[in-house]
Amino acid sequence: MADHLMLAEGYCLLQVPHAPRTLQPYPGPGLDSGLRPRGAPLGPPPPSGTLAYGSFGSPVSFQPFPVSQPPGAGNAHLQSAATPSPGRMPAPPSAAGGPSPLQPAPGAASPLPLPPPPPLPPALGCMDAELIDEEALTSLELELGLHRVRELPELFLGQSEFDCFSDLGSVPAAGSVSC
């Protein structure tokens, strides 16, 4: 089924003799694989009038979609999507060439007053409005054992918590290396 995908690179199904390919060394920044300068057109220059449209011809001869549709064909979804959302006023028909209805004209007053922005959450480092009771803090400190923090030795980076087995308070197993 996928045998055609597992062919060796450069293998052609058509049994046509081909010239051996040679790889060109990288020529530098201004060239594409040494074949042509970048931006240079391939082949002879096209006749005038076909520069922008290539082999499709002029835009009059190539139209990918029909210009007119029968009434009611495929526009029900577009009509529902084109209805203005609540809170937005549709643009008057005279404003077709004017500013976008989503952006107010400079110097014009907004038709609907804007609600005030929601309050920002308190930033880190700000004091809360509620003060915490000092007794609650000390009881929490005692409960968690944080009052002993000043008694513990400082641990520096690169040091292990226990330098020797004697720090553990138990006898090491027989045959182990001690400090």
Curated annotation (Swiss-Prot):
One of its GO terms (biological process) is response to estrogen. It is found in: Nucleus; Cytoplasm. One of its GO terms (molecular function) is transcription coactivator activity. It holds the Pfam family CITED. The keyword Nucleus applies. Transmembrane segments: none annotated. Residues 112-122 have a biased composition (Pro residues). Residues 23-122 are annotated as: Disordered. This is Cbp/p300-interacting transactivator 4. It comes from Rattus norvegicus. The gene is Cited4.
